[in-house]
């Protein structure tokens, strides 16, 4: 399936790409466009748009959730590690929520550097997967204690 989002990914979009690849659609085709193109390409291709105006999963949905958190709550709420990750990504990505989780500032700071050390969004997805894999493993380890 095609998953379409805004280019120059950082916090929420990088995390959502990781979520798609690891849990939702390992064969996904990720497409990065300008914000105004996302919804029309979503509609033309039958894909799923996220973190863009009029996308299936907008930057913030009616409940105030970012696309990562919305996808977790809708499709993966049975995984307590992903639920906790959703809290972190939500706090790091949505303006005014940074103090809602102690890990949010760190994730925001790290994610802000993604486009500074990669050549394009596909490289960001590949290289940032380590961050989200490590975050998942750390939360899982902490929850097992």
Predicted regions and their residues:
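Extended, well-folded catalytic/binding cores that form a central cleft or groove in large enzyme
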Residues: 1-8, 17-18, 22-145
């Amino acid at each position: 399936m095609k998953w379409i989002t805004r280019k120059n990914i950082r916090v929420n979009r990088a995390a959502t790409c990781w979520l798609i690849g690891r849990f939702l659609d390992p064969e996904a085709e990720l497409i990065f466009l300008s914000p105004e193109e996302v919804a029309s390409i979503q509609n033309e291709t039958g894909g799923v748009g996220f973190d863009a105006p009029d996308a299936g999963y907008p930057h913030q949905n009616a409940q105030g959730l970012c696309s990562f958190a919305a996808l977790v709550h809708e499709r993966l709420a049975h995984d307590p590690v992903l639920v906790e990750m959703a809290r972190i990504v939500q706090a790091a990505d949505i303006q005014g929520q940074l103090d809602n989780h102690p890990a949010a500032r760190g994730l925001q700071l790290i994610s802000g550097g993604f486009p500074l050390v990669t050549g394009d969004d596909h490289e960001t997805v590949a290289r940032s997967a380590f961050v989200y894999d490590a975050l998942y493993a750390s939360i899982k380890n902490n929850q097992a204690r």
